[in-house]
A protein has these predicted regions:
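N-terminal catalytic cores of peptidoglycan-degrading enzymes
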Residues: 2-106
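Long, well-ordered alpha-helical scaffolding segments within enzyme catalytic domains
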Residues: 107-144
Length: 144
């Protein structure tokens, strides 16, 4: 009997780990999307999802999104996650973004920035959205 309960419990745990994780839903703020003739028109190769951390001690996610919208000719990514789990879209996923070197840019259909913060609660919300967005992006573009 004990063996049967153990096997049942292990089967249940295994099944739970194989299910998709969608307990946290993020929303995308499109306020800072690049305009029609802004950003690269070159389609990126589906090799990597590029993950960055801003390393900016004082900027909010919103500030970073505004900066990238203004500076798109030199640096921008598809998304910036910050301000308690808000996902700001700047560039168009699937196209080259200018968040890394030329090889990484050409081979990353999605680049995501994470707001730097020392606040634990903000970090936890940001990180949940960051990981979920990275996972969803990898699935969308067939990246293991």
């Amino acid at each position: 009997m004990k063996k049967k309960i153990t096997i049942t419990a292990m089967s249940l745990l295994t099944a739970l780990f194989l299910l998709p994780i969608n307990g946290f839903a993020y929303t995308i703020n499109n306020e800072f999307n690049l305009g029609v003739n802004e950003g690269s028109s070159q389609v990126a190769n589906n090799q990597y999802i590029l993950l960055h951390e801003t390393a900016n001690e004082t900027a909010t996610g919103r500030n970073e999104a505004q900066y990238m919208q203004r500076s798109w000719t030199s640096a921008y990514t598809a998304y910036i996650v910050g301000d308690g789990g808000i996902v700001y879209q700047v560039g168009q996923p699937g196209y080259v973004q200018y968040g890394a070197g030329s090889y990484a840019n050409a081979n990353s259909p999605v680049q995501i920035e994470l707001q730097h913060t020392h606040d634990k609660a903000t970090f936890e919300k940001n990180y949940k959205a960051y990981v979920e967005l990275a996972r969803d992006s990898a699935m969308k573009y067939g990246i293991p």
